[in-house]
Amino acid sequence: MSVTFEGQIDSVLGGFYCLRGYATFRELSSYSKADPSYQRDLISEHKNEMRDFLKKGSYVFFPEIILSYSIKTKNNLLLSQIISANGRNTPLKINKNKTTLTLKDEEKLDRIDGNHRLEAFEKNKGILDNFKVPFCIILLDGSEDDLKKKNIIFHNINFKQIPLSKEKSLAILFK
């Protein structure tokens, strides 16, 4: 069975085209997969914490789940050419007010950030099935550099930020 993701498309810093929108946990979980070449091993304790946080339902908020999709064309068009042609002859359809990406039956998006959240959902199906969550699908051009790009994006998301100290975190919570 195919699925269609809908949202807005634009170019962001670094020249990546992104499709941003909302989908249910079920859709994102069912139509995406973790790539073991850059994803960290799941920490059971963290997965359980995430499950409890999601089930509690109080102040539940988190940033977009970041995924990627490689658009491969017969004549190796550049992504900018595909966008300029409104996605013609690709799974991407670009209109003035919305863009859709339709995946074929067995096709999956690659998870870049949000794997722990999606894994927590998979352990609690039924409870969170229809909760909508924000997503960002980074569009790639299907070149042999796609894996390198995903590795770098994963690294930049997970290792470039300055961790919040426990003391600072508690101070913010109890102000």
Predicted regions and their residues:
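Basic- and aromatic-enriched surface patches that contact anionic nucleotides/nucleic acids
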Residues: 61, 67, 71, 79-175
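N-terminal extension/subdomain marker
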Residues: 1-102
